Amino acid sequence: DVSVEVPHAGFPQKYLETKACRIALQDALLRMFGKALAKKDKTRKASGKSGTVRVSRPGQEVLERTALTISPKTGDLRLNMNVGFPANGRKICSDVLEQILFNQLPPMIENNLIYANLTDAQKEELENVYQLTCNQQAIRQYIQDNDLAAFVANGSVLPRVSGASDLPMEDAVEFKSPEDLEIAIDVPFGAPVKGMKIPLGVTLIVGGGYHGKSTLLKALERGVYNHIAKDGREYVLARKDAMKVRAEDGRAVHNDDISMFIQNLPNIKSTVSFTTEDASGSTSQAANVAEALESGSQLLLMDED
């Protein structure tokens, strides 16, 4: 593993003012640097992992990662990456490694991780990321201030390509809110965002098979995270304390109070301080709900047929 410190990378202070904006900047820079590495890797002549330089590959969510961090106080940037040392048998090819570390990497870092050296297109991309993040946080604040559970914007693309991919499905039907649940939320950048509000309380999603019930619930489940542009779920946002709960046959449970759901067990076990190494479907789901409530969650998501 190789770590690189870039003192005073020079990114505008507004990108670092809030935690959400700083994380979005770090995420965008990591993606930008990853693309530059991918282009360079195509010209690599070595086989296997020899001579490769790799960084963490972000998914669709915008998350804080140790792969790239920026200090909000000093603006110093730290990049952590993995370098596959070029080798010949059991020997490291030091001359090739020197080329990678001292000739190839420095210009890539200078051109992609120092603000003054970015192209106009790269700077515009970072500004778009900043504006999207500000809009997302404004909607999250609206959800909190108005006792909502979640918000789903009109035009959102909820279906994914497959169960093994988190990419948006092409030609999917875009989400449209029912009129009686539609609201418009003012955001710092652009026109108000229209979509469906989900108030706090018990909300039941019903419909026929293949009508998107689980797809909507899955999108709400991921709504605790911000998503990148063109994901389709940029403005599908839920309370930050939302938790998905379900039955987990066979899970271990230790000293959970599930007496609100189950009081009398045939083996005379206490449900006030329930313990087992092999929970059934009902006791595991009861334990999951109890643990979610103990953690402070005010929004439970359950997919039950």
Segments predicted by a language model, with ranges:
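N-terminal accessory targeting/assembly segments
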Residues: 1-147, 158
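Helical mechanochemical/support elements of P-loop NTPase systems and associated helical scaffolds
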Residues: 21, 25, 97, 101, ...
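Short, ordered loop/turn segments at secondary-structure junctions
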Residues: 86, 156, 210-211, 248-250, ...
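Charged, amphipathic alpha-helical linker segments immediately N-terminal to NTP-binding catalytic cores
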Residues: 130-184
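Pre-Walker A adenine-sensing motif
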Residues: 181-197
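Glycine-rich phosphate-binding P-loop
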Residues: 193-225
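Flexible phosphate/Mg2+-sensing switch loops adjacent to catalytic phosphate-binding sites
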Residues: 226-240
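Switch/coupling sub-region of P-loop NTPases
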Residues: 238-305
